[in-house]
Structure formats: C-alpha cells, structure tokens
Amino acid sequence: MIRISLDLMGGDFGPQVVIPGAAKALDRHPDISFVFYGLKEQCDPFLAKFPKLKEKSVFHDCELAVSMEEKPSQALRRGRYVSTMWRSIEAVKTGDADVAVSAGNTGALMAMAKFCLRTMANIERPAIAAIWPTLKGESIVLDVGATIGADAQQLMDFALMGGAMARALFEIERPTIGLLNVGVEEVKGQEEVKEAGRLLREANIDSLEYSGFVEGNDLGKGTVDVVVTEGFSGNIALKTAEGTAKQIAEYLRAAMSRTLLARIGYLFAKSAFDMLREKLDPSKVNGGVFLGLNGIVIKSHGGANAEGIAAAIEVGYDMAKNGLNQKIENDLKKYHAKRLPPIGPEAA
Amino acid sequence: MIRISLDLMGGDFGPQVVIPGAAKALDRHPDISFVFYGLKEQCDPFLAKFPKLKEKSVFHDCELAVSMEEKPSQALRRGRYVSTMWRSIEAVKTGDADVAVSAGNTGALMAMAKFCLRTMANIERPAIAAIWPTLKGESIVLDVGATIGADAQQLMDFALMGGAMARALFEIERPTIGLLNVGVEEVKGQEEVKEAGRLLREANIDSLEYSGFVEGNDLGKGTVDVVVTEGFSGNIALKTAEGTAKQIAEYLRAAMSRTLLARIGYLFAKSAFDMLREKLDPSKVNGGVFLGLNGIVIKSHGGANAEGIAAAIEVGYDMAKNGLNQKIENDLKKYHAKRLPPIGPEAA
C-alpha cells in the first residue's frame, strides 16, 4: 500500500479538480490509500461523488488554505501548522504518508517543505525536478526553479539526486547525465558549470554516467537521461518549451480550420491528431519532484485538470514505490564517503 | 542602394548555399549591391550560375576561410586581416559596406567583429539579438549568447539596444520591453534582474515602455516586443524553443504517416500543412544581429539553406535601411545625458 497525502485545496480549481484526479489515480492503482487535507464544506460535495475514493481515504478538516497568490513568507506565517498545504507535508514527516502531493503555489510549497522536512544530510539546497517528454521517451531536468545560481558542488548534488530519480523512475542502472550549457566555446562566465563538469568527471560515480555538456536543443531530443542546471535557466527552459508547444498547437489549430479541404483532412486524420494531442498534452506529464528533503513532495501544475492531478499523484506513487529517497541517501553517502577521508583515530 | 558584404565561405555548406541565398535576396530587393569575400576557385562555379548577381557584386578573393570548428582565439590568430570572415566585417569598418553577413562560426564571428569594429561608446559588451516568431508576429530577444552573466547596467544597455532594433524592424514608436525572469516570488539570487527592473522603471525612457518581468512562456505568446536577458539563459531559451519545435514536427510527421486514413487526411490538408511548415521553418526567421558594435554584423545559422541565408541578408538589409546603429547611438546618448549630470564649470 502506498500512502499519499493530498492537499485538496491546491491549484487554480481546488477540490473540484483535485478530488476527481485522485479518483482517476486510484482507479489505475488500487494499492493507493489517501490522506486528504481540505476545508470540509468545500470538499464534501465532490467527495460524495466518489464513494470508492471516500472509502480508501481519511479526511482531515483544516483551518485554512494557502492561496495561489500568497508570497512564500506570508504563506508560511499564516499557514504553518494549520493549512491544508502544511498538514499534507507534515503527514510525510510524521510517517502518516509516503509522499505528499499539492497543486498549490510553488513558492509556498517549497518554503513549507523546506521548513517542515528540512534538507537531507550533505544537501545544502533542494531542487525541483521535472519529467521532460523527449523523442526517445522521457528525461529528468533539474533544477527548474528552486535554487537560483547554484555553485559547482550544488550542481554535483543535483546530478546525484537526478541520477537516483532516473533509476527510480526509468528503471535503468546507470543513467546518463548532461550539464546544460551554451554551445559557444571559450565563453566567459558560468565557471560553476565547467567546474561541475570537472567534479563529475573526476568523481567517476558508479550510479551514473557523465556525458558532458548538452545544449537547449538536446532537451527535446532526449540526448541524456538527466539534464542538470541551476534553477534560473532550468525554469526558463521549462517554460519556454511549454510556451513553444502551445504556440505550435495554436498554429496547427489555425491551419486545420482555415479551409474546407483542411477540415476534411482533419476528419480523416483525426486519430492521428488525437495521438499528437496526447503527446503535446502537458497534463500527461505533470508532477515536479522536490529533491533533497527528508521526504518526497510532488508539485502539480496549478492549472492542471483532473488528468494532470492524477499524473502528479502517479509520479509520487512511482517515487515512493521505488524508494526514491532511500536511493538518494545511499548515493550521497557513497559519494561523500569516497570524497572525504575518514576522520578519527583510524585516520591518524 | 544598400551595400552588403557577404562571407561566401560561412556555414555548413559554404558558397554552394550562400551564393543562391544572395541571389534570392537580390531578386526580392533589387536595391542591394554585394561585396563578396570568398575563395575564388570554390566560388566561381556557383557565381557563374547567377549572372544577374554577378553583375550586382564585387568579388574579393581571400587567402583563407575560418572553419566551423575553430575556436574564436584560434580563428582570430589565423584569420585576422586575411580570412573571408574578417574581410567581410572590415568592409563595414572601412565604409565599403553598410552591413556584414556571415553564416560562419558564431564565436569566431563575434571575436572578429569585436576586435575589428570595437564596441560603441557607453557599451561595455555586445549582444546577439534574435528575431523570435510569436503568436502575435515577431519579438526581439537579446542576448542569446554573446555575454554570459550580464549585470544590471548591461541589461539596461541591452534594453536600449533592443528597443532601437524593434523601432527599426517593426516600425513602432515605443516598443514594450520585458525582463526575462522566473515566476516564483521572493526567490534568492538574480539580483541583477531586479536591479535592472528598477533602473528601467526609474529611467523612464521616451523610446521604450518597460512592461516588467516576463517568463519563458511569454516568449512564444509575444507578450512584449523586446525580451531582455543575459546570454546564458537567452541561449538556452532559444535552443530549447528550436528543439521543441523540431520535436513536435517529428511527432506530427510520425502521427501523419502512421495510418492510411491519416495519410489521406494529410493529402486533403496539404496546403494547411504547408502553411504550418512555413510557420515552423527556422530558415524563415534567420539572422542574429550583433548589437553594440560600431557597425552591423548579421549572423546566419550555420545550417541555413539558401532561403535561410536570404532571410539573414534581408534582416541586414532592413537594419541598414532603417539606420539601426544611428538609432542605437541616439538612444544611448539621450539616456546617458539624462543619467550623468553635466561636468565642468556650469555644474559647479
């Protein structure tokens, strides 16, 4: 049984979408049990529609919900201990849940997760990892917005954590890792990226294979299993890709409705278009994973529909089932044991 | 007459593609005259095919061509004064051409352009501006790779230069400017971006309208006319968008060829698909503009076909015709005059 704590009030639509999303995930994975955190009055009407879900869940009525607009510091001040967001995270800390999922505001969720769960030993700053659809399947890209301006050692930590996540998610033994960089040779700056490359080469880690630098266009190609970058450029890459996909979908829609022949063609090719739409549907790949904390927290897109919420829950399910945090801890321990000489009488 | 100096040896295909590209541009703009720099033996067979082009151009035989793989420092050492790339830039300096165009390697072209033309007064570092196709038309995005890690004042300079380019290219009086940032509030780091925002608000510049921060997904929407960022994230955004467009084109191709019905649909909708392909064709929007130098240099994609080369030439044509560098100089002068109190007896 995988126990998932779910913030029912998160996202642009709250329980109206989060509850049907949970029902979808449960349909596909009957070994999920839920711990719900919500505002009772608002949730009850939707829960009533899913009796099977209601049976497989425990509901906790909370004092308040964090809004999508609140600043992290404000959310933390107002919502600590009492909000649906905080309490869903806390359930992971107390051991009442294996993973927490929320579609609430990213900054607040990260602030609360850091405050409540704290970072793992040897990890200075957490990262948000995104699952990126590629021509070869999927890659992991981190950090997409938790830390701005990581140094070489932090990029190294991201590589270790991303590698562990790839092993948990894709079931490959030695995922390939690339550092996101610009193609122009001999450019000034971004010394941290070059230095991280040196660290990765020299560390020669069993659990991952360092493939060198990759560029923005390698993301969609799926050149490597894990792409490592600091949060500013990672966030910009993620949102640029989402924006470009929407833009092209819009061009396509316009092209297909412009002439009668095109509309007829659309009807003939409808199943192909449905397949394409599925590929382009961001809700099919949803769920940013917070890495580096003492507990797994999944962030769903705020604008996700029920299918998107289900996808985020399923990412959490996979991560918990495959022992993501145990894998990360082991990898970090191995790396740091190699790196630091033993301290104490034996070392003398 | 707009005089364009063209490096015939640049790009993955050299004269075989650059010369037909020049012919296309000339067809569409009979008021172009060309100054060509190439290796005679390699260029003659292709030039012979375009008698009208040959008539409207002067050919200079050069000693050598810079390769696509050469490091900037190496290219500069070997190719200064004598290469086709250097000499096409130098023609702008000497006044023999209004603008230089090359599809050669970006790092080498930037290094030579900086060395030969030098930066404008008040500009510390040049930028590369890309023309970005959007749902509303086109935007300008800079810097896409010349400077890594710009400070607030450099971002301010980019805004002024991008604004001048928007006025030259789109013929709007007061283009809107956004600073590329991540959406999460209260994030640490990227103080330069916040500081640049403050500078832009306070400067209250006549020639541009500051619209605040934009995110990666605003690029494709066309939220503002000019998006300003430093070169690392700009380069990653550009290549991520290109990669995503290719990825979706590949999905589309696969979806349309999968079933017989889809293939029939494709035939019916072919003209719509052609329109879509046109929208997605990177060669239709080609030509990175080097800004901040005492002369205009246009960088074409190395992999551009003849249509792409023509597009880059036409960007140069537009920039020269609309007096881009004059506009930039005027805007910089106005800004710095407001900014610095007069020095001398009057100020006392």
Swiss-Prot record, chains A, B:
Homology family: Belongs to the PlsX family.
Subcellular location: Cytoplasm
A GO CC term attached to the entry: cytoplasm
Gene3D superfamilies cross-referenced by the UniProt entry: Isopropylmalate Dehydrogenase
Enzyme Commission number: 2.3.1.274
UniProt keyword terms in alphabetical order: Cytoplasm, Lipid biosynthesis, Lipid metabolism, Phospholipid biosynthesis, Phospholipid metabolism, Transferase
Keyword Cytoplasm: yes
EC class of the enzyme, as a word: transferase
Pathway stated in the Swiss-Prot or TrEMBL entry: Lipid metabolism; phospholipid metabolism
GO molecular function: phosphate:acyl-[acyl carrier protein] acyltransferase activity
General function of this protein: Catalyzes the reversible formation of acyl-phosphate (acyl-PO(4)) from acyl-[acyl-carrier-protein] (acyl-ACP). This enzyme utilizes acyl-ACP as fatty acyl donor, but not acyl-CoA.
Source superkingdom: Bacteria
Protein name (Swiss-Prot/TrEMBL): Phosphate acyltransferase
Coiled coil: none
